[in-house]
Amino acid sequence: IDEIEKAHPSIFDKFLQILEDGRLTDGQGHTVYFSETIIIFTSNLGMYVKDALGQRHQNVSYDMTYDEVTRRLREAIGDYFKLELGRPEILNRIGENIVIFDFIRQEAGQAILRAQVDKLIRRLKEQKNLTLVIPDTSYQQLSDAALADLTNGGRGIGNQVEALLINPLSRYLFDSGIIENATVTVVAFETAAQPPALRCTTTKEENT
């Protein structure tokens, strides 16, 4: 259940019944059992908090340690259920089953970037028999640009891959009339261009 904090208060009543009894019964006596069910709530609770004047401020930031992020978020989550919602019993039922995800750091960012590039390479090969080659020097250009700002997480990295690689590659293939059966090597990423562009070389492959 995505962004549970935006749910109507009545939704919490239903989940409280599930968490307490392990089942949910409607007005006609129909019962659904949750004994073999995993329920996952996701939330941005604690990212921002309100001061005494009701102004919204960022509570955690990228430069904090994971321990500090965890402490601040758990405190803010507790305040939300106890003070703002007035429903501490919900938090009591959840107990310690709260997983705090850290901000994406460079190591994780590199893994996400590599996975997205590899996925594109596989898709081009499978669908169009196009071999996309990105030498280490070119890949480093992409990495430096795509991972320069990690505050938007994995989605931000995906947006950068689309802007710096996928869209320029699509334009290059279209302008070059390349449809399939070729090897495209990215010589350089022109990340400062508007829109971003690629310098590529292409070798046509003979059909076998």
Set out the residue ranges of the language-model regions.
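AAA+ P-loop NTPase nucleotide-binding core of proteostasis motors
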Residues: 1-208
